[in-house]
């Protein structure tokens, strides 16, 4: 009897708490290792949901799990929901549960009816959409945070009048989510730290984006965000980082955020038909754009210090040997196709292993494509000439001390 009375008393006490006190707000998000997501096979967030493929989702989440990622930010468009609400609910539920099974929490990021933010009278129209989302996944253990609006102030600093109206809409939506879901915390994905601060009182979790082009600027934005988070006592995350076209390399920005102990979400996991030219880690088959990104996600970074060991690809005369054999093949009137391919492969491997050329179009890839095609001696000759020109400057003259083991080597 005493146990039952105690349980009833506890329940009454919980119900008496203000709604904000019931909200499941994390104290610290510095351990967040997240990613933005849509499938590589689709273009745009609406198409992702309209052509949703559970097997593809599970494949990609398995890639994320292998990288020890623990959060996913996925856009949830009104346009996909309104087309087929029943299918959308089913697919969203599958996504959240599939992520949760892999230890990955979900941050749904809202996309409302196009242009609706411009008309205040239309703002309440989103209530049915939001209520349906809450009813569908609001009690799922895999749901972590609602991102009620992405970059409402994109992309002006200070905000333009339109930006300010859009930011007001984001605040309105934060209140709506707070009303309809008294448990799950909300955030707004701000483009700039300054605008995150301006909207900070409307959210439970502070979120900013950081595509800054220098380490100093990355650090300054992080410091400003951390200072405001400390003042308010609210947890902080950066929900978008990493872009090869904005001088914001993944390994650089990841290193800065990790060293600052700020949780992050890369944009994005997959190399997609939308942003794939400048973002993304994985191709659908599990191959990657750049292994340095994978290493950085796991906390391993390039040595950019004074103690870098110089690569000496000709230490054992393999570069000299390759250049000699290449030139001999090139001088033949009727060279052998297979022999030339082998020479090209050896040259490509030397170039890649010592990083002697840009890696955006791998030398080994060029050889593989040539092997898979029809014999074309002229094309192979051109490729081998190019590789030989790269290798030739790295030949060591006879007697160069770099041919030898370093001083102090113990036999």
Regions found by a protein language model. Give the residues of each.
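Aromatic-lined substrate-binding rim segments of carbohydrate-active enzymes
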Residues: 57-115, 127, 165-183, 249-256
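Short, well-ordered coil/turn segments that N-cap beta-strands
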Residues: 29-33, 68-70, 100-106, 139-144, ...
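Short, acidic/polar
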Residues: 49-64, 125-134, 190-196, 218-221, ...
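Extracellular glycoside hydrolase catalytic/binding regions
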Residues: 138, 153-272, 276-296
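Long, charged/polar, soluble alpha-helical segments
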Residues: 315-411
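N-terminal carbohydrate-binding accessory modules
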Residues: 21-71, 83, 187
């Amino acid at each position: 009897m005493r146990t039952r009375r105690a349980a009833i008393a506890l329940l009454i006490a919980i119900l008496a708490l203000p709604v904000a006190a019931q909200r499941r707000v994390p104290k610290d998000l510095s351990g967040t290792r997240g990613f933005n997501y849509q499938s590589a096979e689709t273009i745009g967030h609406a198409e992702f949901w309209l052509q949703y493929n559970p097997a593809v989702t599970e494949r990609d989440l398995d890639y994320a799990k292998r990288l020890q990622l623990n959060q996913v930010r996925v856009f949830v468009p009104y346009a996909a929901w309104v087309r087929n609400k029943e299918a959308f609910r089913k697919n969203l539920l599958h996504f959240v549960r599939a992520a949760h099974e892999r230890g990955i929490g979900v941050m749904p990021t809202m996309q409302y009816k196009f242009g609706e933010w411009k008309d205040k009278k239309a703002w309440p129209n989103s209530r049915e959409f939001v209520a349906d989302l809450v009813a569908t996944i609001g009690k799922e253990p895999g749901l972590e945070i609602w991102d009620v609006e992405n970059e409402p102030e994109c992309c002006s600093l200070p905000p333009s009048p339109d930006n300010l109206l859009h930011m007001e809409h984001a605040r309105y939506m934060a209140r709506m989510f707070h009303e309809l879901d008294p448990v799950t915390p909300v955030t707004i994905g701000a483009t700039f730290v300054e605008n995150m601060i301006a909207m900070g009182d409307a959210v439970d979790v502070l979120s900013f984006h950081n595509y800054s082009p220098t380490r100093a600027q990355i650090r300054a934005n992080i410091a400003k965000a951390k200072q405001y988070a400390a003042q308010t006592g609210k947890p902080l995350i950066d929900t978008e980082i990493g872009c090869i076209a904005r001088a914001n390399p993944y390994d650089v920005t990841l290193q800065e955020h990790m060293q600052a102990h700020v949780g992050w979400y890369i944009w994005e996991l997959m190399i997609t038909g939308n942003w794939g030219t400048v973002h993304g880690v994985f191709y659908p088959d599990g191959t990657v754009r750049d292994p340095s990104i994978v290493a950085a996600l796991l906390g391993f970074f390039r040595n950019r210090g004074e103690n870098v060991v110089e690569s000496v690809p000709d230490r054992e005369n393999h570069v000299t040997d390759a250049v000699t054999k290449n030139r001999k093949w090139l001088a033949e009137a009727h060279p052998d196709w297979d022999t030339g391919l082998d020479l090209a492969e050896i040259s490509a491997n030397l170039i890649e292993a010592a990083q002697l050329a840009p890696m955006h179009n791998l030398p080994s890839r060029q050889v593989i494509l040539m092997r898979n095609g029809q014999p074309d001696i002229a094309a192979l000759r051109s490729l081998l000439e190019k590789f030989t020109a790269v290798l030739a400057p790295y030949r060591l003259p006879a007697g160069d001390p770099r041919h030898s083991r370093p001083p102090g080597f113990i036999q």
